[in-house]
Amino acid sequence: MNAYLLLANGMVFAGQSVGAQGVTVGEVVFATGMVGFQETLTDPSYYGQIITQTYPLIGNYGMNKDDMESDRIWAKGYIVREACTTPSNWRCEETLDSFLKKNNTIGIEGIDTRHLTRIIRESGVMNGAILTTFDPADPANKAETEALLAQIRAYAVTDAVKNVTCEKPEVFNPQGEAHIVLMHYGCKRNIVRCLVKRGCKVTVMPAFATAEEIKALAPDGIMLSNGPGDPAEPVEVIENLKHIFELNIPTFGICLGHQLSALAAGAKTMKLKYGHRGANQPVTDFESGRTFITSQTHGYAVVGDELPAEMGEVAQVNANDGTCEGIKYKKWNCFTVQFHPEANGGPKDTEFLFDRFLNNVKAAKKEAR
């Protein structure tokens, strides 16, 4: 079946349908990973977005239940050059096409994803729609196309954290030694895995849990997860964080957790032209002088110059564009990073940051004795 991608600027790409059929509207972004496509699709950070994979062949090792980063696909749509129909891997359970259909996700293949990526790089991320219902390039469909364009241009990702967070607390590895509260702003499962394999008890809490609720759990440490959307939108979460930091419990923030912490500290965030989405982003650490290759999934960044000097300092920057990638706080017992040390997919070069966080937890427990 034919499928079409209609961008907010009026451009039309014609291809073939993959996954579910119908119409879906979202923010069109691109991700540069060669692998990790299942993790990308199920990452809540992509809530409200249509993902373009820049690598030309996607789905070649298939899909399975173990590589899920949440229990469903959060992306609004999926764009690939070619969707592999004959995946080969001993862990493979189904094809990309069947996985998309099972999750009612509309996709398109057979378009020039290289050209589309260049458009996004030059013009910035823009809204768009994938549809199988009519050809928007056909003059006979002018009225339908104009109506859809109006819908595309009015689209905005809103209430992202509210829509992806958990409804109630959940405990993992209850016999673990260090008790870590993980704030769920759109949490990937591998954050939980990284903590559990280090012997931690993990209590995942809804995004809007208050400082009083956190304190009642008597945690040894707090983690602030990744997540989607404009970090300045969930004002209640930001205000809660100010009170959570006053508990003086060792805290480690990732991605959206990094941005929310900076906003709570009085800094500002900005929307990037086309974001950082992929597994090959270089980050330079000021303290060590080393540059690490990291996995990233964000469209916003902290404005490092806006961080009050008495609150903290920028600790890492992106080696490509100089944007803030990490903050070490002075007033709070906290450090945060914009990238994903838990990876999945991507390099695990910075997974040692979990160990650094747990060393802070151990030091705080020892001091409290």
Where are the language model's segments positioned?
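A glycine-centered loop/beta-turn motif at secondary-structure junctions
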Residues: 326-368
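Beta-strand-turn-beta hairpins that frame and shape the catalytic cleft
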Residues: 175-180, 288-291, 329-334
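Cysteine-nucleophile active-site neighborhood
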Residues: 216, 220-221, 225-301, 346-364
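Proline-centered loop/turn at the N-terminus of a beta-strand
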Residues: 106, 179, 250-252, 268, ...
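Active-site-proximal beta-strand elements of phosphoester/diester hydrolases
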Residues: 179-184, 294-295, 335-339
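Catalytic beta-strand/loop cores that center a nucleophilic Ser/Cys/Thr
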Residues: 290-331, 369
